[in-house]
């Protein structure tokens, strides 16, 4: 909208999610591609990631304007003053807890824009999605399909919901006539096989990220902790039930299509990798 006819180059560890019909050049993060981009000229360069390598790349790239986080004088810095708020909230928990902006408002502001409800963009393989639509229609027998994303990655395991609660939820949903589809990546494979055995819920296995997105597109409701699945569900405009505990609840923008479920006892381990309680707060959801 702002710049009219644009040419986009995008580098990421997960190129499968970037919409191919809107981004002209999509690069997988590796040494060759980092070097390639570092030696190109751009009108605008944006980095919204505070990881050292990403900040160093923004410092190396030749661009008339730079937004976001950059590497300067041997440490993380901001490309413009607009990124200072997000940098400070990432360092000081007591300031982060007072933040009332959602993540999209924050990243739009970093880029000197106002967030006005713009929707996510994602790469959806419609052919794969149609194949899975037919398969899932056959095995769900007309029931409403609920995608249950049981894991949360390895970074913050404090977000995991207890196994016995997942089993209880699945059995209750099945009793109400829903079709439960267990979902996750390779880190959740063993756990999802356990749930399938305990409940007879359907588990299809693990897939490439592109195919995972295509399968998720054929659910009507998604239940998940805060994870990549949350972003996929929002991009696919699915109804979402989000388990939340360790982050600032104001960060999340669900576009009026979801609810956030939190522990009734609160959470003491803000952005924590371990819980000091005898019983994790996730037992209180």
Model feature map: region roles:
Residues 1-285:
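Catalytic machinery of carbohydrate-active enzymes
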């Amino acid at each position: 909208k702002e710049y009219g006819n644009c040419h986009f180059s995008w580098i990421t560890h997960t190129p499968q999610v970037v919409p191919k019909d809107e981004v002209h050049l999509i690069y997988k993060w590796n040494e060759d591609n980092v070097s390639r981009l570092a030696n190109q000229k751009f009108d605008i360069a944006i980095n919204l990631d505070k990881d050292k390598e990403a900040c160093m790349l923004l410092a190396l790239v030749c661009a008339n304007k730079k937004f976001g986080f950059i590497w300067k004088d041997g440490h993380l810095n901001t490309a413009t003053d607009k990124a200072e708020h997000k940098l400070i909230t990432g360092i000081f928990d007591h300031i982060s807890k007072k933040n009332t902006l959602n993540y999209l408002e924050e990243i739009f502001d970093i880029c000197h824009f106002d967030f006005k409800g713009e929707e996510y963009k994602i790469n959806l393989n419609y052919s794969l999605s149609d194949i899975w639509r037919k398969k899932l229609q056959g095995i769900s027998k007309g029931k409403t399909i609920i995608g249950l994303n049981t894991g949360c990655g390895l970074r913050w395991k404090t977000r995991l919901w207890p196994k016995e609660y997942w089993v209880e939820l699945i059995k209750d949903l099945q009793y109400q006539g829903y079709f439960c589809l267990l979902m996750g990546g390779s880190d959740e494979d063993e756990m999802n096989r356990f749930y399938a055995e305990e409940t007879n819920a359907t588990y299809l296995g693990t897939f490439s990220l592109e195919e995972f997105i295509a399968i998720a597109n054929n659910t009507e409701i998604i239940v998940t902790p805060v994870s990549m699945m949350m972003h996929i569900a929002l991009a696919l405009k699915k109804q979402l039930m989000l388990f939340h505990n360790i982050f600032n609840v104001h960060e999340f923008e669900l576009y009026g299509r979801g609810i956030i479920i939190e522990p009734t006892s609160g959470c003491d381990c803000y952005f924590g990798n371990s819980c000091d309680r005898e019983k994790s707060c996730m037992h209180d959801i």
